[in-house]
């Protein structure tokens, strides 16, 4: 699977179960009518109960240069330290939106399908926020790669 290039995303939530976030590349568009993304989340992950209870999330697609933030959210760093490392605003669902993200998709989880060790979260997009002309970031062959042209 390391040969499948993918955008690098930080998935965030906030709500009754608390605030949490993790790095994910298993994210993709499902349909534009209604606008829906999918996010894959391991049920054994420490953040799974928080996302499962809150039922909202924000997909923050990272720009080139945000590799350290991706690494922070991809490790065992305490949540308060993860969120302290960047600037956030609150989306319409109440989820944290990364101010410098390439794009942020504010979503409600509309359906969950379990496959193997993971839940596939189908996410109905409620709002989209784009940042002005950043460069994209992808994960390919177990390393980061910056896109050479503006992604949007």
From Swiss-Prot:
Catalytic activity: FMNH2 + NAD(+) = FMN + NADH + 2 H(+)
Molecular function GO terms recorded: FMN binding; FMN reductase (NADH) activity; FMN reductase [NAD(P)H] activity; riboflavin reductase (NADPH) activity
Taxonomic superkingdom: Bacteria
Database matches in InterPro entries: Flavin_Rdtase-like_dom, NADH-dep_flavin_reductase, RutF, Split_barrel_FMN-bd
Segments traversing the membrane: none
Keyword Mitochondrion: no
Gene induction: Up-regulated by the nitrogen regulatory protein C (NtrC also called GlnG) and repressed by RutR.
HAMAP family reported for this sequence: RutF
Name the record gives this protein: FMN reductase (NADH) RutF
Native source species: Shigella dysenteriae serotype 1 (strain Sd197)
Gene name as annotated: rutF
